[in-house]
Amino acid sequence: METPRLLFVHAHPDDETLTTGATIAHYTARGAEVQVITCTLGEEGEVIGDRWAQLAVDHADQLGGYRIGELTAALAALGVDRPRYLGGAGRWRDSGMEGTPARRRERFVDGDVAEQTAVLAAAIDELRPHVVVTYDPNGGYGHPDHIHTHRLTTAAVEAAAWQVPKFYWTVTSDSALRTGIAALTDVPDGWVTLTADDLPLVGFTDDTIDAALDLGAHSAARVAAMHAHQTQITVAPDGRSFALSNDIALPVDATEYYVLARGEAGERDARGWETDLLAGLNLR
């Protein structure tokens, strides 16, 4: 049987863990070849706590380099041997949220799209993934780098000589998010809970989702990867919730959801969802 190959394309260190961490751990545990390409170093991230606060952009501006170590440790927890960066580490800078001022180095969203597409298409041709995963058109919650990553990955999948059999978007399930938030009854002091309607996340309805992977067996690996991103993520002691620098509590969902953007779906369950991103592929 041919070894399955999956490629995840993400904008910043920690995105791979927050959106697809359990999926990555699941497929590495199955013996698949899993690669993660990260488009920036995440230099513009807000830093949690005081220990590494001086690394932030308005101080030493060394956060991006530090986050290479965090990403390396997180990927190791998920079973991936090393990080890969689009164009090499530091080629394009984290663009920040909408309204973030331009820095001295070219921002990811301002980069030459043709060059970026060619670099990613070349990586696809090198790695020959059976499955490629990136964000939905809104980038999950509207971050400019996530939206740009979606557009770039879509273009690269089209431009690559290697024909990617299945191309997915990682998405948030609206119903699962609401259920998870309702269950957050005991969160650490200082954290706040919001309704799903008050969050910037764009949830997908059940009838628009194509795949749901129930990955409770890999929750521990995902939580370990979250802990590795200590400048960006705080995990509750019970491991059931987490918060970013804004201290908004979010559930750790044991299921990760996907929309199939290109390719043929495999077998679906009674809910109408695939339960394996490799479903329908002939890897013999």
From Swiss-Prot:
EC number, as in UniProt: 3.5.1.103
Catalytic reaction equation(s): 1D-myo-inositol 2-acetamido-2-deoxy-alpha-D-glucopyranoside + H2O = 1D-myo-inositol 2-amino-2-deoxy-alpha-D-glucopyranoside + acetate
Annotated binding of Zn(2+), by residue: 12, 15, 146
InterPro entries: GlcNAc_PI_deacetylase-related, LmbE-like_dom_sf, Mycothiol_biosynthesis_MshB
Pfam family, one: PIG-L
GO molecular function: N-acetylglucosaminylinositol deacetylase activity; zinc ion binding
GO biological process, any: mycothiol biosynthetic process
Coiled-coil annotated spans: none
Cofactor or coenzyme needed: Zn(2+)
Keyword set, alphabetical order: Hydrolase, Metal-binding, Zinc
NCBIfam families: mycothiol_MshB
Record's function text: Catalyzes the deacetylation of 1D-myo-inositol 2-acetamido-2-deoxy-alpha-D-glucopyranoside (GlcNAc-Ins) in the mycothiol biosynthesis pathway.
Protein name: 1D-myo-inositol 2-acetamido-2-deoxy-alpha-D-glucopyranoside deacetylase
